[in-house]
Regions:
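Boundary at the C-terminal end of the N-terminal hydrophobic targeting segment
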Residues: 19-24
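Hydrophobic alpha-helical membrane-insertion signals
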Residues: 27-50
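Sec-dependent N-terminal signal peptides
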Residues: 6-15
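Aromatic-lined, polymer-binding surfaces characteristic
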Residues: 51-239
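Functionally constrained cores in energy, signaling, and assembly domains
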Residues: 10, 46, 85
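N-terminal secretory signal peptides that target proteins for export/translocation
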Residues: 1-3
Length: 239
């Protein structure tokens, strides 16, 4: 009987410990979410442009003046994501007439869904792996608290973990890591966030070979042996 009671107490303590750990994880996610939210809400918004884009959005969530199908080095579909970001900022930022306007919220979700399904391509891999996801994640994060769980799961499926691709080094690695961190924050997935930060930390080393990364003389190489301290390097250090 004593052993049975001890076992029950032990299991209860284990359960309590797991619950406490889960609560702490969620607190960390909320801290990260609020910091990201604060950063994005500091951006300026063009309410007039958001109204115009809202008015001319098609019923499927697209815009007629954007080419979603032609695959070229230039990525015209990027304009779709920039519009959604401005609209999401207008919806999320207090003090403007579009703040928490429900028709706007519906159209932003529609626009995210359209982009996710259409999955526009580019002749430049950077837009596929980094550029488009880095812009798609912002309006989705801004609307996170306004979405049902199934909407979050569906929409965040566009954000794919690219950190396992070892070809992504230096600044490119911090970019794909940021996408993963946002995905984890949007989905309340602590492990994805931790993996993203670990991926960023992996860039902090001296690259001895003729490859991308930090060098012994404190310079930064990107695009293989090219010296890029003032471009990619400055951006990498700011991360």
């Amino acid at each position: 009987m004593i052993m049975k009671r001890l076992l029950i107490i032990y299991l209860a303590l284990c359960f309590w410990g797991e619950c406490s750990y889960a609560v702490e994880k969620q607190k960390d996610i909320e801290i990260l979410y609020n910091r990201l939210l604060e950063e994005y809400l500091s951006d300026s918004i063009d309410v007039s442009q958001a109204e115009k884009d809202l008015a001319v959005m098609q019923t499927d969530g697209s815009w007629k003046d954007i080419d979603y199908k032609t695959v070229t080095f230039y990525f015209d579909a990027e304009r779709h994501l920039k519009r959604l970001k401005n609209m999401a900022l207008a919806y999320s930022k207090p003090g403007n007439k579009l703040f928490h306007e429900q028709e706007l919220r519906k159209k932003i979700i529609l626009g995210l869904d359209y982009f996710r399904i259409a999955n526009p391509d580019s002749g430049n891999w950077w837009y596929r792996d980094i550029g488009a996801p880095s812009q798609y994640m912002i309006p989705l994060l801004l609307l996170k608290k306004e979405l049902q769980r199934e909407d979050v799961t569906r929409l965040s499926s566009y954000l794919v973990d690219k950190t396992d691709n070892m070809a992504h080094k230096g600044k490119n690695r911090t970019w794909v890591s940021a996408v993963l961190i946002h995905k984890g924050c949007i989905e309340d997935d602590y492990e994805l966030i931790a993996k993203g930060f670990s991926s960023i930390a992996s860039t902090i080393y001296v690259e001895e070979k003729d490859d991308e990364g930090m060098k012994r003389d404190n310079s930064i190489h990107q695009h293989r042996p090219q010296l890029y301290s003032g471009g990619y390097g400055m951006s990498l250090m700011s991360d």
